[in-house]
Amino acid sequence: MTLQLGSHGPLVSRWTDVMLRRFRSYALGVDGQPLRNDGYYGYDEQKVQREYERRTNQSQDGVVSDRDLGALGLAQPIIFTVEGHMSNMWFGPCADNARLLQQQGVAYWQPVGYESNKLPFDNKSGVNALAQLVGSTVLPDGTPFPPGTPWGIIGFSQGAMVASDFLDQQILNGPLSWRLKDLKRSLCLGNPRREFGKCVPWSPKPPPANTGGIMVHREFVTTGTTLEGRHAENCNNGDMFSVNTNDKAGWDKEAIATIITENSWVGGQAAIFTRVLALLGNVPGEAIPAITALINAIMFLAANPNPHYATVAETGDIEWMRAVAA
């Protein structure tokens, strides 16, 4: 993101601060006084940038380029977004959040494409895509992402599973742990791996405190870790994927969800039903309709946009991610 006449926001403030500290002799406005750090890029700032360009043998256009920002250690914070099953990476609650913050000059938005149309899920493709992006020092369009750049991540539904797997396998305990110190914010929406009892206070329909994601035995625990205070979970009560109980009924839901979303299977719902019965053991006849209904419900949620979430990011989610630039 370049800075030019009319630019405003946190990045302009950071640039002004660096110029005042490092180039005090010429970080002066047209009136000869030191630049005023008001977060606005005007004629005073343009004058200083042209002098910087002259001294660094560049064309003197008064525009702070991505290359200049990188040279000054001012690469813009990056927000990665991972939408849900059968999604378009450019649209959804994650995309809306990051798009708005990019428009406000807070951060640069990098959507993440992965194989989101498969059932069973192909979460590994999302983890690999994130590993390639976060592990690089330059994003695909040339945006600088050097070590030390603040960054954040948002995931929704299947994308929340991808984000959780990525943070768990690559950032907390993996080859990209060098990015951990610069991870400022992570946010999961409707996460099947939601930690039990963890939910943001601004959820419009908060779940019961003694619930977690449908993947009961694979909850993404951040409490007591280095991510505590940096990771948030937003969940709406009634979302089968992110609201489950740690009891026999909850374990049955987890088993069915695991078979549908993660295991290899062929033969449609009949094959799934056979595998579920084999997994659950002796099932009384009167329980079969309930199991069938549960399979149908999870199949529907796995194959369709989640009905429990709007496609517009909530204010609390946006403000949480805004701190990526703090």
Language model features with spans:
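Surface cap/lid and interfacial helix-loop subdomains adjacent to catalytic sites
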Residues: 81-113, 117, 124-140, 169-326
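Gly/Ser-rich "nucleophile elbow"/oxyanion-hole loop immediately N-terminal to the catalytic nucleophile
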Residues: 136-150
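Gly/Ala-rich beta-loop-alpha elbow adjacent to hydrolase catalytic centers
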Residues: 153-164
